[in-house]
Amino acid sequence: MTAVSLSDGTGVLKTDPWLEPFSGALRERYAAYQKQRTIIEEHEGGLAEFSKGYKSMGFQVDKNGGVRYREWAPNATEARLIGEFNNWSHTANPMTKSPFGVWECYVPPVSPGVCPIPHDSMVKISMTIPGGESIDRIPTWITRVTQDLNISPVYDGRFWNPPKDQQYRFKHGHSTRPVEGLKIYEAHVGISSPNMRVTTYKEFEVDVLPKIKQLGYNCIQMMAIMEHAYYASFGYQVTNFFAASSRFGTPEELKSLVDKAHELGLTVLLDVVHSHASKNILDGINMYDGSDHLYFHEGGRGRHDQWDSRLFNYGHHEVLRFLLSNLRFWMDIYMFDGFRFDGVTSMMYKHHGIGSGFSGGYHEYFGDSVDLEAMVYLMLANAMLHENYPHVVTIAEDVSGMPTLCRPVAEGGVGFDYRLSMAIPDMWIKLLKEYTDDQWEMGHIVHNLTNRRHLEKSVAYAESHDQALVGDKTLAFWLMDKEMYDFMSDLSPLTPIIDRGLALHKMIRFIVHTLGGEAYLNFEGNEFGHPEWMDFPREGNGNSFAHARRQFNLVDDKLLRYKYLYEFDVAMNWLEDKYKWLNSPQAYVSLKHEGDKVIVFERAGLLFIFNFHPTQSFTDYRVGVDTAGEYKVILTSDETRFGGHNRIDMGGRYFTTPMEWNGRKNWLQVYSPSRTVLVLGL
């Protein structure tokens, strides 16, 4: 047996002895992390200092009003700062180059305290590259870029330095709520209203934040904040890593939004894209200094065939500075509380997960197919964040099931707090597309909801933005389809399709919430069964906003049945707030009955009885429960306020009998109506 050590990366063997055959790979990974960390300690004064690159690179205004500008561009032979401030002069502000390839210039104040570059004016760096060609680029550390589609789709870099009276002053610090028990509301500012246009930061703050709070979520995951030239990329083709998207408003307005969220007690996560970058040259960081390999790998290794984007060289010192400082920037300047890391599977493997089914065999997670440099970057990122921000939350989007992903770096893990349970939404879509209700296997559903790694927390969700994208559709639309157009009014008949859709939509969300993980996620609009799908304005749809919005008005119209799904979301989130099942050990499942289509489990002192049978209700249905006593109804999806049929007596009492049943010490008998969940508690 390998001796378990906390200092060589094999500490994870304590929680998973099956990793024993791969202890060599774990040691190698941890040694690579320690080596990179040692280099940073020796040359940069430590990881904390190294990750503050945003304080020295890009534009820095000194106390006298002068501006120092630094840019890493080793391939350039000459460089100069140009902009509206110097009438785009190529001679007024030349830059000098350090031995490490960093260009620098200082623009003195006009007079003491008066900045020479006007606030929000346009700026660029102009470089001469080998061969004599002159190229213009937007500074990589720029904090604001804007787009005027009447002139060009290419972004303009802007020098953001508002006067003191226009700078937003935070009233609240980072969230200090525990990392556990997250109920995450995944949101995209631009689509966050029923209007056929881009919604603003201010509108989101005023109109949407109170909804999120009322719904009972305690965390927001904000998509598409990092600037992206192509709106239809959903924010995943980032061009400017330090710029908050100007489509939605100004940097100060985003700060105000985050501050208001903190006032409401919400944790705010940024959907960070460090897995790849837009291949845009004129307004991105591709071919920045004329070379193919500045921030990225050269040639094929630096390109993602499916995403048509560039791939970072995580082994390069300056790339590490750029990415680690990017995380620190969003934490410090905008007060985000953590990150959902996009595309982690693509980062961790040289094959980027393409063509790999991932059977779960441990050999798939170690060896030549793993990108060790990317793994080290993720370990450095998590170490830096958790060492400097005690309440930070990091979530990995990984489909592969990488062991140790959510164990601390000190043990030899990768250091994330959570992973997304990406197999769960896939299961629901497959069931709804390919199987009739009486073909659903209860054992299959339970397995998918509980098949997660011991002591590695996961975020469960029935659907996210991925399922809503064009080509797919929301769960509600899979369930009810075109009948949603004609029969979602209380004044219209309750058709069998709508009745089934409302019932299953509640049950699917609730069983995922209660059985599926240690955190729960919902994509905005799905809490009330948003119809159709997501599709951003683009050439292929006549630049239409029809599907790039969230129709909250459907809930506000009290004649429509969407209110029932919304109210159930409120009830289940606030019930979790009271009983805290997300922060409890995994549920004990005592029954998966294929014939009856019934699932029974206990978690956080509650007894959950799900009857998925399309037609069969059961009288005096016997279920096992461990704790004896008098049980009462805590919640049922069949209540009238949730669009149910009111078949359960809310004042009913259920007494246990001290006799073993389904592996539990006691049993009680209930009435279990079809397509209904019943929650009992002492």
From Swiss-Prot:
It is found in: Cytoplasm. Its main location: cytoplasm. Disruption phenotype: Disrupts production of intracellular glycogen. It catalyses: Transfers a segment of a (1->4)-alpha-D-glucan chain to a primary hydroxy group in a similar glucan chain. The keyword Cytoplasm applies. GO terms for cellular component: cytoplasm. The active site is at D342, E397. (1,4-alpha-D-glucosyl)n binds at W88, K124. Its EC number is 2.4.1.18. It holds the Pfam family Alpha-amylase_C. One of its GO terms (biological process) is glycogen biosynthetic process. The record marks D466 as: Transition state stabilizer. It comes from the Eukaryota. Pathway: Glycan biosynthesis; glycogen biosynthesis. Belongs to the glycosyl hydrolase 13 family. GlgB subfamily. This is 1,4-alpha-glucan-branching enzyme. The gene is GLC3.
